[in-house]
Amino acid sequence: DVYQLLHQQGVMLESKAFAMGVRVEHPQSLINERQLGRGVDIRLTGSAEYALTAQTLNKTSAAYSFCMCPGGVLVPCASEPGTLATNGMSYSKRNGKFANGAIVVPIPSSQKLFDGLTLQRQIEKNAYEAGGKKYSAPAQTIKNFLAKKSDKILPPSTYSCGVVPSNLWSWMDKKICSSLAEGFINFDKKIPGFIDKGLIVAPETRTSSPLRITRNNDTMESLNTQGLFVLGEGAGYAGGIVTSAADGVRLANRAKKENSSIP
């Protein structure tokens, strides 16, 4: 709604590339063993992480891990009624029984300004309906995702609103699904068991904004709207907590430089 409002008021926006996909969960013990070795004392090393990338065979797309949460949990993060999106987090000790991470596919910037946002919203609406319209998340084992069939019974998940079996191919973007499938096959070669022990919980749509409010890189002010300073994730200049905070520090330092009364 904010993007539409800004556009109606004449604020300059532009389409940008972003990424969408799913969240995957695995037993943390599997990730620990594959990444650190059998018998390692996790109390000394901490829970293991992974960073994975794979290019599709035709080299037109890719899949990669993002925001991996060792010993973490999955959480809902819908921002509109009738939509569903997931995210992941780890508590400070990172000692939960499950690891989760986003596995996402690049979405190129579109020629039409709101095409990326429209696709994002459609996937979130489809997910809400596939989950039973009660904010339960549609889920599928990676093994059955590759076979394009629903599960009868799902393994445990940390997602707080519960999960329901769903064939993701029936409601997610087919290009995203195809790239994810190739990615999973590649990742299983790097982390054996990634397919057999993996559960998909969908969707992960909020890696970054599909739109950017254009700004002057030096002043951080909108290019055509005086007094509007844009920063952080929603404005299209960050992809997470730390990068958003860093963008805020830039603006604070600039304001302090121009106004000597700021302590």
Model-based region annotation:
Residues 1-263:
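Residues forming the flavin
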